[in-house]
Design a protein with these regions (language model features):
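Structural alpha/beta core scaffold segments of enzyme domains
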Residues: 1-202
Length: 202
């Protein structure tokens, strides 16, 4: 099976794509590798870690847009200081990279969905996905399993949304799991940061 994954902002953070369904992971992987798809990367297609790092560094040369707290006359203190220290700290985007990549098992039958997965906040799934799929909350049963690490990543509901779409499309039980490459490419990253710290000593 080749199943289209449609864009659902609340469930997939605006993503869409194609799911390959087979009777084994190896077969599905080989079938996916054989697909020739041209993706439109959109306005962020040229953005990279390097280009974003340069943008952050450039922002530090501009006047601040927000000052959280300011006491005394910092400019005068720095001018009269006998010694000065200044350094930059950069923190890159970080993926959760859980030991167990994102996955979810789902069934669909007669308007009822059932999920199995290591969900950190199952209430998010119960509160959000029934409405998106046009069913009542009681038509979705969630079974919690052990998880190989979470770190906040399994608070997202994108894997559950994908599994529900595929299960309904093929009307068979389906186990959705991402490769490590999928996991890294589609994670909700910890934000990158760039800081400049200056200190004066007397």
């Amino acid at each position: 099976y080749i199943v289209e994954i449609k864009e659902m902002d609340a469930g997939l953070r605006g993503r869409n794509g194609i799911a390959v369904v087979a009777d084994s992971f190896w077969t599905a992987q080989k079938a996916r590798d054989a697909l020739q798809i041209v993706w439109d990367a959109g306005i962020n297609g040229t953005v990279s870690s390097d280009s974003y790092s340069k943008k952050l560094k450039q922002k530090l040369t501009e006047p601040p847009t927000v000052i959280i707290e300011e006491k005394g006359n910092n400019d005068e203190v720095f001018k009269s200081a006998s010694a000065k220290l200044e350094t930059d700290y950069e923190f890159p985007f970080l993926a959760h990279a859980t030991i167990e990549p994102v996955n979810c098992t789902a069934t669909y039958k007669n308007g009822n969905y059932e999920l199995w997965g290591g969900f950190q906040i199952p209430g998010n799934i119960a509160d959000t996905l029934p409405a998106l799929f046009g069913v009542k909350r009681e038509n979705l049963k969630i079974n919690l399993t052990l998880m190989g690490g979470g770190f906040g990543r399994r608070a997202s509901i994108d894997n559950a949304s994908e599994a529900m779409q595929i299960a309904k499309a093929i009307e068979q039980p389906v186990k959705v799991y991402w490769t490590r490459t999928d996991d890294i490419q589609n994670d909700a990253y910890r934000p990158a940061m760039y800081h400049k710290l200056s200190a004066s000593l007397n």
